[in-house]
Amino acid sequence: MNASALAENRSESAGRLRGLARRCRELAEMTMVPDVTRELLSIAAALDSEAERDSRR
């Protein structure tokens, strides 16, 4: 795999992770269970962090 294909693949991966994080935040807004809300927001933060790491490589 060449360098540009690798960079594109990382960008797509980071985008998917950010999309999942966004969906977790949306679900957190919909739920009325505080523990579930906290867990979804924690997952969203972890996904955002991973996306940021992917985009920097």
Model-predicted segments: where are they?
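Long, non-catalytic architectural segments outside compact domain cores
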Residues: 1-57
